[in-house]
């Protein structure tokens, strides 16, 4: 049993070789990338999927400046669209990674308003359907051990190594975050 995001057709729920559901704005909190209510419009863009340690499926909707760009699906099937002020103007997201403690790191490929790409970090504190206790942070600049700014303009990928360090692939080379769980505070 698994889910597949698509760049136009929404979210698919699959078991074996059988498609159980296709989620679109008609049956889930997704929105179309542009204003077109036609059911044949191929503009429901769901990407950046990851599971957290509680079994919640997190997804980012891209393209078209979606007001509620994050969607979570809890293990019981409840889905909710979520927004944070720092990502309301994001036009395209990259990969998302959930740390073992539940903190999520989401790459920003294109921010329309100011052009600042970077990493959005958020922690739902174990209450994915309630944002009142959430912590979040947008990071567009990193600093190395000597205090020198790493002037990355593009962020490509994320990986967690066996020691718990987070690696971010950028146009300026790799960035290593030694303690990513505490980076949000």
Give the residues covered by each predicted segment:
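Carboxylate-rich, polar loop motifs that coordinate divalent cations or form catalytic acidic clusters
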Residues: 1-185
């Amino acid at each position: 049993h698994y889910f597949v995001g698509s760049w136009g057709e929404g979210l698919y729920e699959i078991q074996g070789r059988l498609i159980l559901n296709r989620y679109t704005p008609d049956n889930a909190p997704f929105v179309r990338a542009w204003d077109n209510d036609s059911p044949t419009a191929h503009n429901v863009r769901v990407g950046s999927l990851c599971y957290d340690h509680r079994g919640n499926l997190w997804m980012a909707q891209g393209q078209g400046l979606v007001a509620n760009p994050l969607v979570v699906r809890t293990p019981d099937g409840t889905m909710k669209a979520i927004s944070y002020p720092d990502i309301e103007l994001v036009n395209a997201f990259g990969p998302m990674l959930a740390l073992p403690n539940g903190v999520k790191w989401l790459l920003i490929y294109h921010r329309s308003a100011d052009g600042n790409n970077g990493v959005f970090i958020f922690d739902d504190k174990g209450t994915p359907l309630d944002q009142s206790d959430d912590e979040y942070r947008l990071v567009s600049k990193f600093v190395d051990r000597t205090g020198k700014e790493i002037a990355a303009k593009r962020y490509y990928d994320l990986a967690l190594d066996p020691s718990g360090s987070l690696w971010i692939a950028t146009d300026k080379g790799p960035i290593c975050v030694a303690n990513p769980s505490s980076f949000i505070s």
